[in-house]
Amino acid sequence: LIEAVRAAEALNGCIIPLMTKTASLSAIQSAITDEIFYALGLGRRGVLRRGLGWVFALPARRFARHMAAVDGAVGEGGPAAGCQVMLDRLGVRVGARGADRIPASGPAVILANHPGAYDSMAIGSLIPRRDLKVLVGKTRFYEALPNIHPHLIGTSPARGDSMLALRAAADHLSEGGVLLQFGSGLIEPDPATDPVGDEVFDRWPPSMEILLRKVPETRVVPAIASGVLLPRFRDHPLVRLRRDAMDKRRLAEFMQVIWQLLFPKSIDARPRISFGQPFRVEDAGGDTRRVMPLVIAKMKAQLEDHLRWSR
């Protein structure tokens, strides 16, 4: 669900859409309710979903209205505008460092860690390019967002889907676009509250090797986000009902975003985003087999620098 918010993008290149489409509030609300049940471990379909969906009508309706506004802002002003609309509605103030390191043109990948919540909204609000695309997990939610959905690169754990997504991402880069990619695609610990060990980076797939092999002129910008998932939600008793660590973080981030939408002034949220120096495959001696070790080394160095700056 949160990844849907992260997906605010503009059309490819500098093309401005001739008409902004209007999202259906009922379709968005239905999709949001599906995601509520999924976050709780109850499934997006079934008897419970059909019988108890009304219980979440108020927060789902409120979220739907906000998402419709974000979708409209993306259609009119591009990804940064859409991201900023949601951040404003959440009452979030972003602290940033190094945003001027993002290439103004040409193929580029913003490679980031993934603590969840609104990390990509915070990052997206700092990317001034209209050709931004985001790699996201497939879900019905996106289909209810007409100005966002056409500009996503959807993927899933299925090998066929992941390869198609990488091909689409490579095509976008070859056309000179910018891509926002989260290392593993899974929710990870927030560096502001939890240690980020080697095991986190060990889960990152070698997708950058594939992309840089196909588009070697791509510049990669390491980015670190922190301070997005607050301890009061991470440690909430309801979160303990989920066993898997990633499911716990998914539920915590969902609860936090819903709470902030309902009570935007009740939380002083100040995420921190930092960007490192861009690098290319030539920094690995032109050998794509050495790209992932270089990528991981750059991300670890950026994490250390980020923690020194943000504390």
Question: Residues of each region from the PLM?
Answer:
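A structural motif
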Residues: E175-P189
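Catalytic core of membrane glycerolipid acyltransferases/transacylases, capturing the structured
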Residues: A108-G160
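Membrane-anchoring hydrophobic helices of lipid-metabolizing enzymes
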Residues: L18-A108, Y118-A122, R129, S266
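A structural signal for short, well-ordered beta-strand segments and their strand-loop junctions
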Residues: K133-V136, L180-F182, R219-I224
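Gly/Ser/Thr-rich loops at beta-strand to alpha-helix junctions
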Residues: H114-Y118, L186-E188, V228
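Short amphipathic alpha-helices and their capping/turn segments at secondary-structure boundaries
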Residues: A165-E175
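N-terminal amphipathic/basic-hydrophobic helices that include classical n-h-c signal peptides
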Residues: L1-L18
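A cross-family acyltransferase "interaction/gating" segment
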Residues: P189-A284
